[in-house]
Amino acid sequence: MHPVRKQRLMTVLFIVIASSVAVGLMVFALSKNLNLFYPPSQIVSGEAPRGPTIRGGGCVVPGSVERASDSLKVAFSITDGKESVLVRYEGLLPDLFDEGEAAVVTGKVTQEGVFEAVEVLAKHDETYTPPEVENAMKESVDGVEHQKTCEGLDYAS
């Protein structure tokens, strides 16, 4: 093989290998920071992974909020109209957090199916519902439009 051709081949191989390593490292780094969204029905059915950090959301079930008297621990249930999942959180809840309103939680699902939240986000006005929650509500209750704001939701399920 001619020396110039050999040098060109080595340069191309180096670029291909370096690019492959760079892409692999980026995919690895991004996968660690990826929080996928799961509605309560997918969490209860086991579709949501146990252990890694995920996001979940739905409407806070009225009457389900229980606050500890001696700490900042709070437990409540969220529903998508099909299933409900228990959420445990320790910390201050957002000012707009309320029963019957949409919430998105970030955390891990335990082996028992309890969502251990590290962050709770509440909708920030009466007409806004997080897109993930809105889509989950539409899918779970035959696309009924009033579900976007958690009104008229059958919380008995």
Swiss-Prot record:
The chain crosses the membrane at residues 9-29. It is a single-pass type II membrane protein. Keywords: Cell inner membrane, Cell membrane, Cytochrome c-type biogenesis, Heme, Iron, Membrane, Metal-binding, Signal-anchor, Transmembrane, Transmembrane helix. Its main location: membrane. Heme binds at residues 124, 128. The keyword Transmembrane applies. One of its GO terms (molecular function) is heme binding. Residues 30-157 are periplasmic. It is found in: Cell inner membrane. GO terms for biological process: cytochrome complex assembly. GO terms for cellular component: plasma membrane. Residues 1-8 are cytoplasmic. Heme chaperone required for the biogenesis of c-type cytochromes. Transiently binds heme delivered by CcmC and transfers the heme to apo-cytochromes in a process facilitated by CcmF and CcmH. PANTHER family: CYTOCHROME C-TYPE BIOGENESIS PROTEIN CCME HOMOLOG, MITOCHONDRIAL. Belongs to the CcmE/CycJ family. This is Cytochrome c-type biogenesis protein CcmE. The gene is ccmE.
